[in-house]
Amino acid sequence: MQEQAVFTQKTEPVPPTGRFAPSPSGRLHLGNLACSLLAWLSARSRGGRIVLRIEDLDAERCPRVYADLLEQDLDWLGLVWDEGGSHGGPHGPYYQSECAAIYTESYNKLEAQGLVYPCFCSRAQLHAASAPHTSDGNVIYPGTCRGLTAEQIAEKSKKKAPAYRLMVPDEDITFTDGCMGPHTENLLRDCGDFYLRRADGVFAYQLAVVVDDARMGVTEVVRGADLLSSTARQLYLYRLLGLPAPKFAHCPLLLAPDGRRLSKRDGDQSLENLRAKYTAQEIVGRLAFAYGLQPEPAPRTPESLIPDFSWDKVPKQDIYLPENLF
């Protein structure tokens, strides 16, 4: 299966619909902001729209106060969206915590195809089994529970509630990423059977984003390179559910000068702190400089970057945040 995803045209028959899809588990940091800026520019430079979706599947870790703050931060930066979040719109709900019934419908379609099975393995068991890992650090599931009989499932269910996985074939998925170029993954070898639903009933990221992007009319997904390895799984889900797949562009990660990934948990360069030191235009301009969109870190508004935006300018390698840039 091949999904072309090259963003080169300034005008298209149907303008693209991009999206912001932050997880409100803390304040936005520079890496989140850079990805949001690129998503906004990619869509706006071709006359497109932006949807804001709040990815709060785990509601306990994502209090609504953080969702409200990230809306304020995006608005302050000038990254205005057209629908979603607290603004609402025709494709709601826009908060994943409110979409369980919608996800259940798609989950049931996959279950009806005979592709879903219960998994009783713990994370500790998987790591102890020395199974191979995906490029994003997750364990590639070795299929331990794939062939359980009905009797075995009934017996194990007495002791532990299962999670549920999607069975994948030994098949290559090939697509052309709008930033990273051609990419191929084998579903069985590189991904493995993956979670659709946790043991506590919460739906997994892979299913939720596919269902949401399709029902919201998203035609291009711009996100961090750490999610590149999710794309093959999601393209497979689009096919199984009979949904149109968007184009993808995975932007390089923004790293601290010492090579660490920026983290909400560590408070790295959070917008809460940056707003006390810089104007919105200074932050946008310095991020644009770091990502090759302008030759110097001069203050810029997002709108001023639209005419000259091109994915050809964006590096393919992770970007080390220059010392003293922020």
Description of each model-found segment:
Residues 67, 100, 123-126, 138, ...:
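Alpha-helix initiation and N-capping motif
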Residues 94-109, 133-139, 162-170, 290-305:
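Short secondary-structure transition/capping segments
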Residues 124-263, 270-274, 326:
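Active-site cores that bind ATP or allylic diphosphates and position pyrophosphate for catalysis
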Residues 117, 122, 229-230, 240-326:
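Catalytic adenosine-cofactor/nucleotide-binding cores of aminoacyl-tRNA synthetases and other
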Residues 80, 116-117, 135-136, 151, ...:
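A general structural signal for well-ordered secondary-structure junctions
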Residues 75, 105-115, 171-184, 298-317:
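A short, terminal or domain-edge coil/loop segment
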Residues 2-130, 134, 225-226, 230-243, ...:
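N-terminal Rossmann-like or analogous alpha/beta NTP/dinucleotide-binding catalytic cores
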Residues 28-30, 200, 277-278, 282:
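Structural motif
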